[in-house]
Regions:
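Intrinsic disorder and flexible/low-complexity segments
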Residues: 1-107
Length: 107
């Protein structure tokens, strides 16, 4: 997992490595406040080595150009990494890159 095109190491567009290729995560299910967004933030920030607190902005970053690897992400918040969350399947998505999710974690 990495954050790219942000202003600091704890802020940027979320990308996940699958099959040796970096790709984006679609904001479906996690773009609005609620348990799914909270779970996503907790897992992603924790996986990156941050406190697990933060926000998930859907704008402010350039659109990704890599494949969209994950869509309809549903994390309880207890998973060790994003691939352990429920999602549609690697590369199974109905998103455009303007829907790429960002992340801002508390350092």
């Amino acid at each position: 997992l990495r954050l790219v095109d942000g202003t600091a190491r704890n802020h940027g567009r979320v990308e996940v490595l699958h099959a040796g290729v970096w790709g984006t995560v679609c904001d479906d299910f996690i773009s609005t406040s609620g348990p799914r967004q909270t779970g996503f933030i907790s897992v992603a920030c924790g996986q990156l080595g941050f406190s697990g607190a933060g926000s998930a902005p859907t704008s402010g970053f350039p659109d990704g150009v890599d494949p969209t690897w994950m869509d309809d992400l549903d994390c309880a918040g207890t998973e060790a990494s994003l691939p352990m969350c429920t999602f549609r399947g690697w590369g199974v998505e109905n998103c455009a890159h303007f829907e790429d999710i960002g992340l801002s974690c508390t350092p």
